[in-house]
C-alpha cells in the first residue's frame, strides 16, 4: 500500500517595499528600496513554508509585477502537488514557464522550509550541515571616493572584516576609492571589487595594475555576462582572482565556465538560480572542478537571506558570502527569526526549516 502524499492547498503572496537608509549605487544603476514578494505555501497537513522573490530587471529580467503574474500561474499548477517532491515541482514549473527565476526561487524556498519542518531540522542541516554560521562581507556602493572610505571605516568599526567595493563607472574614481579605503581600514581587512559588467578586458587589466599596491584579492564580474573567453583571458594575464556572478545562473552556465576556465570562484544567487535546488547543482559542479563558490544576494529580506546563509553554512565548498542587505534598511518588523548577527557573522536558528514566522 502506497503512503498518502501531502498536498499543497494554497499559495498566497504579498508585495513589500522597504526604503533603504540611502540609495545603493552600482555600475548598472541605483536602488532606493528593498522590493520583494513574500510567498506562503500551505498544505493539507498543517505545514506551511515561506519564500521570497526579489526580482532584478537587469539580472533576472523580472519585475515585481511579472513575479506576481507568474505566481498566480504557479498557484494553479501547484495546488494538489506534493510539496516534498521538489524535483518534480521544478520540472513542472520549468515546463510551464521558462526563466522567471526569482518567482521560482520564492516557491523553491517555501518548499524547502516545509521540508525542514516535516523533518524537524533547520534548513542548514537539511542541505548538508557543515556548520551553522556564516561570515559575510559588507558591500560599499559607488560614491565619492572619500565618502566610500568613510563608510568602509565605519563598517570595519562595526565588526566587518571583508569589504566588497562596487566599481565600474569611472576607473579613475574606482582606483582612488580603493586607495582611500585601504588607507582608512588598514592592512588586515580583506578587499574585493565588483564591477558588475562595467569594464572590458583592457579596463580590467588596467584597473588591476593600478590597484596592485592595495592588496585587492578578487574582482567580481568585470566583463559582460556572455564574455567567458574574456574572463578566461583575464585569469591568464591578471594576478587577481576572477569571480563570475551574472554569467552564472544555472548548472549549464557553471559547466560552460569550467570548460572555458573562466572562473576562480562562482557567486551563486538564489534569485538567479531559481532557488536552492539548482544552487546545489552549481556548487557540486564547481566543487568537482576544484572551484570554490560564494553566495550573494539581491536587496533581500531575512527570508531569502536565511535561505542563502543556510546554503553557505551547509556546504564546505562555499567559502564566502555576500549576504549583507539586512544592513541597508531598518529591520522589517513583519519577519521574525531566521538568524541573528554578531559582528560580521550570521548565526542561523536551530528551529525547523527557515525558522522564520511572518503574519500573512
Where are these regions (language model features)?
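Structured beta-strand/loop patches that form or line metal/cofactor-binding pockets in enzymes
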Residues: 3-45, 50, 54-57, 330-332
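Conserved, mostly hydrophobic/aromatic
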Residues: 8, 39, 46, 107, ...
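Metal- or metallocofactor-binding catalytic centers and their adjacent structured scaffolds
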Residues: 10, 42-118
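Hydrophobic faces of well-ordered beta-strands that scaffold small-molecule active sites
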Residues: 49-51, 134-140, 163-165, 189-195, ...
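Glycine-rich phosphate/pyrophosphate-binding beta-alpha loops
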Residues: 53-61, 139-143, 297
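Shared catalytic-loop signature of beta/alpha-barrel
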Residues: 69, 215, 226-243, 248-343
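Metal-dependent enolase-superfamily TIM-barrel catalytic cores that perform enediolate-based chemistry
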Residues: 125-238
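Structural signal for terminal/edge beta-strands and the immediately following C-terminal loop/tail
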Residues: 281, 340-360
Amino acid at each position: 500500500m502506497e503512503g498518502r502524499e501531502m498536498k499543497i492547498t494554497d499559495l498566497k503572496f504579498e508585495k513589500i517595499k522597504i526604503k533603504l537608509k540611502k540609495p545603493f549605487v552600482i555600475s548598472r544603476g541605483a536602488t532606493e528600496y528593498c522590493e520583494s514578494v513574500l510567498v506562503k505555501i500551505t498544505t493539507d497537513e498543517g505545514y506551511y513554508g515561506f519564500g521570497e522573490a526579489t526580482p532584478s530587471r537587469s539580472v533576472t529580467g523580472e519585475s515585481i509585477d511579472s513575479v506576481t503574474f507568474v505566481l498566480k500561474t504557479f498557484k494553479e499548477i501547484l495546488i494538489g502537488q506534493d510539496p516534498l517532491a521538489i524535483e518534480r515541482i521544478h520540472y513542472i514549473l520549468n515546463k510551464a514557464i521558462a526563466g522567471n527565476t526569482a518567482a521560482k526561487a520564492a516557491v523553491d524556498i517555501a518548499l524547502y522550509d516545509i521540508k525542514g519542518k516535516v523533518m524537524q531540522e533547520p534548513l542548514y542541516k537539511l542541505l548538508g550541515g557543515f556548520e551553522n554560521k556564516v561570515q559575510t562581507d559588507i558591500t560599499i556602493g559607488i560614491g565619492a571616493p572619500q565618502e566610500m572610505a568613510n563608510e568602509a571605516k565605519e563598517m570595519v568599526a562595526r565588526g566587518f572584516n571583508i569589504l566588497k567595493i562596487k566599481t565600474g563607472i569611472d576607473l579613475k574614481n574606482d582606483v582612488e576609492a580603493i586607495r582611500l579605503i585601504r588607507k582608512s581600514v588598514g592592512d588586515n581587512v580583506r578587499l574585493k571589487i565588483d564591477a558588475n559588467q562595467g569594464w572590458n578586458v583592457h579596463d580590467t587589466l588596467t584597473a588591476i595594475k593600478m590597484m596592485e599596491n592595495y592588496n585587492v584579492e578578487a574582482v567580481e564580474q568585470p566583463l559582460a555576462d556572455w564574455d567567458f573567453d574574456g574572463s578566461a583571458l583575464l585569469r591568464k594575464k591578471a594576478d587577481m582572482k576572477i569571480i563570475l556572478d551574472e554569467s552564472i545562473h544555472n548548472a549549464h552556465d557553471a559547466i560552460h565556465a569550467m570548460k572555458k576556465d573562466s572562473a576562480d570562484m562562482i557567486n551563486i544567487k538564489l534569485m538567479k538560480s531559481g532557488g536552492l535546488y539548482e544552487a546545489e547543482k552549481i556548487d557540486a559542479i564547481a566543487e568537482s572542478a576544484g572551484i570554490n563558490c560564494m553566495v550573494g544576494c539581491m536587496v533581500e529580506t531575512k527570508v531569502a537571506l536565511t535561505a542563502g546563509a543556510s546554503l553557505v553554512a551547509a556546504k564546505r565548498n562555499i567559502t564566502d558570502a555576500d549576504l549583507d542587505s539586512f544592513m541597508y534598511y531598518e529591520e522589517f518588523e513583519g519577519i521574525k527569526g531566521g538568524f541573528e548577527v554578531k559582528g560580521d557573522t550570521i548565526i542561523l536558528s536551530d528551529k525547523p526549516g527557515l525558522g522564520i514566522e511572518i503574519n500573512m
